[in-house]
Amino acid sequence: SYRPWNILDTNPDLFNRMIAVNTRAPFFLIQDAAKIMIRENIEGRIINIGSMSEQAGQPFLCPYSTSKGALATLTRNVGFALMRNRIHVNQLSIGWMNSDHERKLIESETGDPNFIDRKAATKPFKRILDPKEVAKAVLWMASEDSGMMTGTIVNFDQSIWGAYDDAPSPENALDLPI
C-alpha cells in the first residue's frame, strides 16, 4: 500500500528504488540510445517524463522529488552534451494527472472515489491533466515541429512555478518515525 515518505522516515531501500526507476534507468537508456544514434548517424529526439515535484516537491514525496530533480538535471546536461550530434533531449514535467493508477491510489488513501473530481473542480481549468493531452505534448516534443529545442524542461501543469497568491508552506512540523 502507498505511504508518504519524507526526509525523516525514508529508508535506504525506498530511496534506492526511486533513484533506480526515475534516474538510473533513464540514464542508461539514454546512454544506450545515444551510442546507437551516434554510431548510425541518426538525428533524433529523446523525451523524458518528469514531474512538477522535481522543482522542490511536497514534503511527503521527498525521495520521489529528489529522483525526478536528478532526471531534470540529466535532461539539461545530456541535451547540451548531445546537441552537436543532432540528438535532442527534452523533458515534459507533468503535474497532477487523472490516470487510472492515480484514481486507485487516491481512493485507497482517502476512501473517497470522488476525491479527485472534487479537487479538480477547484483548479483554474476545473480539471487535472488528462493522459491523452500528455501524450499529445510528448508527440509534439518528439516531432520536427519542436524545432531545435534541446535540454529543455517543459512544465505541463495549471500553475506557474513560483507564482502563487500565497506561497505554499507545510501544514505541520514533521514527526520523527516511530
Regions found by a protein language model. Give the residues of each.
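Substrate-binding pocket helix/loop in short-chain dehydrogenase/reductase
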Residues: W5-I7, L14-N16, K119
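C-terminal substrate-recognition "lid" of short-chain dehydrogenase/reductases
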Residues: F27, R127-F156
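Active-site helix of classical SDR
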Residues: I30, S67, T75
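Alpha-helical segment proximal to the catalytic Tyr-Lys
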Residues: K35, F80-A81, G147
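Residue(s) in the substrate-gating loop at a strand-loop-helix junction
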Residues: S51
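Short, small/polar-rich loop/turn modules that mediate ligand/substrate recognition or access, typified
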Residues: M83, H88, M149-G151
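Short C-terminal tail/terminal secondary-structure segment
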Residues: T150-I178
